[in-house]
A protein has these predicted regions:
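Conserved NTP phosphate-binding and transfer environment spanning the P-loop NTPase/kinase superfamily
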Residues: 388-391, 397-570
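Flexible beta-alpha connector loops of hexameric P-loop NTPases
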Residues: 298, 308-329, 361-376
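N-terminal pre-Walker A segment at the start of P-loop NTPase domains
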Residues: 206-241, 276, 284-289, 293-300, ...
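Carboxylate/His-rich catalytic cores and anion/metal-binding grooves
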Residues: 193-195, 201, 257, 264-295, ...
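Phosphate-binding/switch loop-helix module in NTP-utilizing enzymes
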Residues: 320-354
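Glycine-rich phosphate-binding P-loop
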Residues: 240-272
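N-terminal accessory targeting/assembly segments
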Residues: 1-185, 189-194, 205
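Conserved P-loop NTPase nucleotide-binding/switch module
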Residues: 340-383, 387, 400-406, 410-427
Length: 570
C-alpha cells in the first residue's frame, strides 16, 4: 500500500495527459486514519463515474461495540452513516469543474426504508464505504488539480465528519439504533402473540403522492379499534399500543377512498424497518409476507398449480405447468405456489389487482357453469385450508364482493381512515345467509422440483477460430426489471421491491446462478438456499466479477429472489 503523498505525486505527473492515464492511479493509499482505494477508473469523463472506497478500522472509527453486535445493528448503523455521508458529499459534488461527469461525488440515496447496501458495510474489521467520483477533465484531457482538490480537501472532510464516532451526532445515532431494536422486538412479539402484523396508534399511513414515499401532511393518525388493541413491550420506548392483526384470514373492507388500500400498502412495506419520522416506524408485518396480484403475460415454468387449476380444455398438465403468456388466473395461482415455495406465511391481496375468476365464483355462476366445466378452484375455497394445513394467513382488501365474509376470521372496516372491527356484526348477518356446501377438490400440498436450465452463452466468432462466448451483461431498468444478456426480466409487479439497487442485486444473483450453479439438476430452492448462505457469510462480494464490489447494490429478501428467478424466461 502506498501513502497519500505518492498519490499526489502521481496525480501531478499526469496533469494534462490523455484521460486513460488516470488508470495509473488504481490502488490503495493510506490517508491518516483511513485507507482510500481507487477500485475502478472510468474510461472517459462522459462514462459512468469511477468507483472509490474508503476503509476505517474499527478502532479508529470508535463506534461502541453495541452498535455492531448483530446483523440488525450493523445494517442500521451502515444505513445511518450512508445518509450522513450523502449529506456531506452533496456540499461538494460538482464543485470541481470540467467536462462530462467531472466533479461528481455521489453515493446511494436511501429512501424511507432501511436496507443492507454495498454503499456502507460494517464488519469486525471496521467500516467500508463505497461511492462514485467523476474524475475531472477538460475535454478528454486530465485536470489533475481538480481531482487533487476532491481527494485531498473535499473527501477528507466528508470522511472525518461521517465515519468517526467522535465527530457525529451521537444522540441521533443512539436513537436510530434504539428504534431498530424496538422494531425488532415487535417482530419477535408478532410470533409470540400469533399475529401477522401490528399498526401502532398514531401511525401516519398515507403517502405524500403517488411518486413520493414521504408521509402525507395533515393526514388522519391511525387509531386501533378497541377489540383488536394490544400492547407491545419495547426495550427502549417501553409500552406501545396499536392494532394487532391475528393469524388466519383477515378481510379489510370499506367504501371507496376510505383507506383500505392505504392500510394494505403500509402492511406490505411493513416487512422493512422504516426511519424515524416516516409515520410507519411501528407498522410491522411478518417479514415473510408476500403481496400477490394477477400478472397477465408473465412467464411460468414448471409450476404445480393443480391446487387451483385442473382439467384444462387443452389437456395441459397443471401439475407441471408452463406458459410464456399467463392469464390473470394462472399467473395468480402460480404466484401463490411460488410464494409457498419461498416460505411466505402471509399473503396480501387486493381485490382491485386480482383476477376475479380466480378469487371467487358466485352461486349464480356456479348454476350456469357447472363445476365440471370450470377448471379453476377459486381462492375463496382454498384460503381456509391454506391456513389450517399450510399455516399461511391471508390479508385481503375487498370493496365489491362479500363472498369472503363467511370464511374470514377477522373483518376490519375502514371508515373515514379509521379501522372498525365489524367481525361480530358480519358473522351475525352471515348466519342468516349460510353458504351452500361445495364439492371442493381435496387440498394437496403442491409438489416442486423446478430447475433452472444451464445458461448457454451466445458464441461469436470473429474471423477465424471458434470464437468466445459472450459474458452475460446486466442493464438495470430502475425498479421495473433488468436486461440479462438478451433476456428481459420484468419485475414491475413485484410490489415489495422498493429500490433499484435491489433490482441490480437480483440481476447479479441471477447472473451468478446461471453461470455457476444452474446445471439442469439443481432445483430453484437449492440454488436460492446456496445464494442465501453466501450472502449471510460473505455478502454480495461473493457474486462480484472482479476483486471488488462497487456501490449500488442492496440485498433483497428471499421472496424477491424467488420472484426474480420465477420470472426469468428460460
Amino acid at each position: 500500500m502506498q501513502q497519500a503523498t505518492e498519490l499526489k505525486k502521481q496525480l501531478q505527473s499526469i496533469h494534462r495527459k490523455s484521460y486513460p492515464a488516470y488508470k495509473s492511479l488504481k490502488g490503495s493509499y493510506q490517508f491518516g486514519h483511513y485507507i482510500l482505494s481507487i477500485d475502478h477508473v472510468q474510461g472517459d469523463p462522459f462514462a459512468s463515474p469511477s468507483h472509490i472506497s474508503v476503509h476505517i478500522s474499527r478502532k479508529d472509527a470508535g463506534f461502541p461495540d453495541a452498535y455492531s453486535k448483530n446483523n440488525l445493528t450493523c445494517i442500521t448503523l451502515a444505513d445511518h452513516l450512508t445518509r450522513q455521508f450523502e449529506q456531506q458529499i452533496n456540499h461538494y459534488s460538482f464543485r470541481s469543474k470540467g467536462s462530462g461527469k467531472s466533479g461528481l461525488i455521489s453515493v446511494s440515496h436511501c429512501g424511507q426504508e432501511i436496507l443492507s447496501r454495498t454503499a456502507c458495510e460494517i464488519t469486525s474489521k471496521g467500516i467500508t464505504a463505497r461511492f462514485f467520483i467523476g474524475f475531472p477533465a477538460n475535454g478528454r484531457t486530465i485536470n489533475a488539480p481538480e481531482l487533487e482538490k476532491i481527494l485531498f480537501d473535499f473527501l477528507p472532510a466528508c470522511v472525518e465528519n461521517t465515519f468517526f464516532y467522535k465527530n457525529i451526532n451521537q444522540e441521533e445515532l443512539e436513537q436510530t439504533i434504539f428504534l431498530a431494536e424496538d422494531q425488532q422486538a415487535i417482530r419477535e412479539q408478532l410470533k409470540e402473540k400469533k399475529l401477522v402484523a401490528f399498526v401502532a396508534d398514531g401511525a401516519i399511513l398515507p403517502r405524500e403522492s403517488g411518486i413520493s414515499s414521504r408521509p402525507m401532511k395533515h393526514s388522519v393518525p391511525f387509531i386501533s379499534p378497541e377489540s383488536l388493541r394490544i400492547t407491545m413491550n419495547l426495550p427502549h420506548k417501553g409500552k406501545i399500543i396499536g392494532m394487532g392483526i391475528p393469524q388466519g384470514i383477515t378481510l379489510i373492507v370499506g367504501g371507496g377512498y376510505h383507506g383500505k388500500s392505504t392500510l394494505l400498502n403500509a402492511l406490505e412495506l411493513g416487512v422493512y424497518n422504516h426511519i424515524a419520522g416516516d409515520g410507519r416506524e411501528y407498522v410491522i408485518t411478518d417479514n415473510t409476507a408476500l403481496k400477490l396480484r394477477s400478472e397477465d403475460g408473465r412467464s411460468i415454468k414448471d409450476v404445480d398449480i393443480s391446487l387451483f387449476i385442473n382439467d384444462l380444455p387443452n389437456k395441459k398438465n397443471t401439475h407441471c405447468f408452463s406458459t410464456a403468456d399467463a392469464s390473470g388466473s394462472t399467473s395468480q395461482a402460480a404466484g401463490i405456489i411460488e410464494g409457498m415455495e419461498a416460505g411466505s406465511k402471509v399473503f396480501l391481496l387486493d381485490e382491485d389487482t386480482s383476477a376475479t375468476n380466480f378469487m371467487v365464483r358466485d352461486t349464480f355462476m356456479q348454476e350456469i357453469i357447472s363445476r365440471e366445466k370450470e377448471p379453476i378452484t377459486p381462492f375463496l375455497e382454498r384460503a381456509q385450508k391454506l391456513y389450517t394445513i399450510a399455516g399461511i394467513s391471508t390479508l385481503l382488501v375487498a370493496g365489491s364482493s362479500g363472498a369472503f365474509f363467511h370464511i374470514a376470521d377477522t373483518i376490519i372496516q375502514m371508515d373515514c381512515y379509521r379501522p372498525v372491527d365489524i367481525t361480530r356484526k358480519v358473522k351475525e348477518i352471515c348466519g342468516k345467509y349460510p353458504l351452500s356446501p361445495a364439492k371442493v377438490p381435496a387440498f394437496v400440498m403442491p409438489d416442486s422440483h423446478r430447475i433452472i436450465q444451464k445458461n448457454t452463452p451466445v458464441i461469436h466468432s470473429h474471423g477465424h477460430g471458434t470464437g468466445k462466448p459472450d459474458r452475460l451483461k446486466i442493464k438495470v431498468h430502475g425498479k421495473a426489471g433488468f436486461l440479462l444478456g438478451r433476456q428481459e426480466v420484468d419485475l414491475r409487479y413485484v410490489e415489495q421491491l422498493i429500490d433499484p439497487e435491489q433490482t441490480a442485486a437480483l440481476g447479479l444473483l441471477l447472473k451468478y446462478a446461471l453461470e455457476h450453479l444452474a446445471d439442469g439438476k439443481k432445483t430453484i430452492p437449492e440454488i436460492v438456499d446456496y445464494l442465501q448462505k453466501q450472502i449471510h457469510t460473505k455478502g454480495l462480494i461473493a457474486f462480484a466479477d472482479g476483486s471488488y464490489l462497487p456501490c449500488g447494490y442492496a440485498i433483497p429478501r428471499i421472496q424477491e429472489i424467488y420472484s426474480c428467478f420465477n420470472r426469468y424466461r428460460q
